[in-house]
Amino acid sequence: MSEKRGYVELPRGGCVVQTSQGPIQFGAPPETIKDSLGTETGVPEILVLPREMFNWSKGINVADMEFPIYYHFFIRGKRPLICGTMEQARLLAVALQEAVFGPKNFDLRDDSIDISDDVFVPDIRGEMAFFRGELTLKSLFRYRPFKDGRLVVGDVEIAIDGDDYEVRDGGRHVATIPGRITYTARFDVGDALPEPFKPPRFGVTCLGPSHGFDPKDNTSGFIIWLNHNGVMVDPPVNSTEWLLRSNVNPKFIDSIVLTHCHADHDAGTFQKILEEGRVTIYTTKTIMESFLRKYSAFSGESVDYLRRLFSFQQVFIGRPVTIHGGEFDIFYALHSIPTMGFRLSFQGKTFVYSSDHQGDPQVQRTMLDQGAMNRERYEQLQHFPWESDVIYHESGIAPLHTPLKFLASLPEDVQSRTVVYHIASKDFNAIGETALQRATFGIENTLYFETEPSVYEDAYRALDILKRLDFFESLPVKKVQEFLSIIERRHFARGEKIIEEGSKGDYFYIIESGNAIVMKENLVRGKQLGAFEYFGEVALLTGSDRTADIVADTDLETIVIPRDRFLNFVSGTEFGRILQRVIDRRDNRTWNLLVESDSFARLSDYQRMWLESYLEPLAYSEPRTIVAEGDRLPGLYIVSDGRVEVRDGDGGVRSIERGGVIGYLHRIMRDEPARYTYSSSGPVEMLFMPRSDALELIDRNPGLTMRIGDPSA
């Protein structure tokens, strides 16, 4: 932890000030409780909400009060004090209702298509009421609102000062706290692979084995690999950076299974949504609507807007859903909020995930006797699929979690197939010698199932690559058939030159796995290419010589298409039109600008390449107003040379120079007016993306809405 200007910065984010009332924490990104648990002063009992509760650039909630509340109330028997505005109180209550007690109104019949004798739809409201008891949000924590921009706790006064907080103690100024909170991921990686990871046909990679109160281990979450694609289950908040540091391309994961809305299971979901492409989330309608209400409250965005950022695939009780060839049969677990587990079948192998679940038969019997569940639900819970080949089962603190002693009482054959997660190492080891095994995180510890390739595997993999290329979506079936007939596969060793500058073009390349680098003298940095990215199209479509060297940065697996076949394939297609546009607008000066500008720092090279294809040069030689306050933003502007003045209604002036942006994709998408007037006092050169093109780009990459541009535009 670093100390500055009267406060301490927590490693993951947020600030702590020592006062006469004890430590006060400002902001709470996910898992900051792990930072404070090991300190002398412990977890602060007073927490101040940040000025903005959601950090869109990181895709995370930075006002995660769930675990501080759980810790103080359920472990210490205290009611923490949370401070913020009255509007934040309202929003926090909405979010915590979903996270702590679950939705107020729901009907699991919405999660079933076929309500018949062979499809049992439980009524879990009694179970949720059993776990809730007499608790209310008011019984869990205290809330103190700011009045006229200030609040007092004992001798401590906290005042809102613009975007920041001023803290005085006993009349003495002690700290100025930034009101906007960032997040820094902290996690163990394990042994990173020397070469990029190649996803297996069927496997499981544990991202973390433990729970949200364990400062020593990663929080639980895992990836299921099916037909060489990844399905992330309950992504931890750091999952994407974990993958990158482990030498795993995050683009292999195109789907999420969301089991419930506790912070240690849903906190990383929006991080994944804000990556390249459009992610598909699989869950029930009940859980999805709860998730949207929770994050609408934290982010301040409407539920309708959040829905536009990803694809939702509803799953149903009693109707298995197929994801990458695996059949998922879902069921509702026994927990305090709606929570689903699933049994997965793939090529004769089975894997079951309990999710958070109270699996103790004695507790279930008590709930039956007290009328919290009916006999049919009790019988369903008693018939957990212990016969599965691999059992991923949680264990934790009662009453919400399965006690380890119950799992240790299972027959040895069942124990030997059971992997226990959601538990700290010290707690697992305390049970003594058993046949159980604790989940082992790390890409090097991926569990591989023995399977055989299907007769269609090569075609499936080729089509999977095809669908990942954004512009192939509009191809008719006959073109897809043609694609399968014209492709070849090629391997390149690390360091091997694939394309030489000045040579004639003979192939179009698509990367299946591994990395390549584009090397050209006038680029400020070589372009990095990874899985599902392509190259070599310029020389084929223009007849010109190759314009750069491309070298295999790792061992590389590619799909290639010979020149004549490629030209015939793209002729007259939307794909060909888009490729030609990319070629026409590609410019090394534009690329260098996008690489050098902080405005595009969080974009991948592939996203920069796509953005580059939409940008048009625009120049004004005389002073002029570019966008007036109140006008609809016609598109996105990037200053490439010159200066643009920004004036607000109060007469304040600032300037935008090279790499600066006018507009914000989020506001452009919603056709909202500009908040400031932008004008040039002399010659200025810019790059411009019209609103129609911006909407097309956003549809393919929804996460870009919060990553490009000035939020204040």
Language model regions located:
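Metallo-beta-lactamase
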Residues: 122-155, 180-181, 190, 285-339, ...
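Catalytic core of the metallo-beta-lactamase
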Residues: 316-372
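Di-metal (Zn2+ and/or Mg2+/Mn2+) metal-binding site signature of metallo-dependent hydrolases
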Residues: 249-276
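Active-site metal-binding loops of divalent metal-dependent hydrolases
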Residues: 28, 207-211, 235-238, 261, ...
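Non-catalytic propeptide/linker segments at domain boundaries
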Residues: 121, 127-214, 218-221, 226-231
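Cytosolic regulatory regions built on CNB/CRP/Popeye-like sensor folds
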Residues: 433, 445-713
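Short internal beta-strands
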Residues: 279-289, 417-422
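Cap/insert and terminal regions of metallo-dependent hydrolase folds
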Residues: 1-131, 138, 360-449
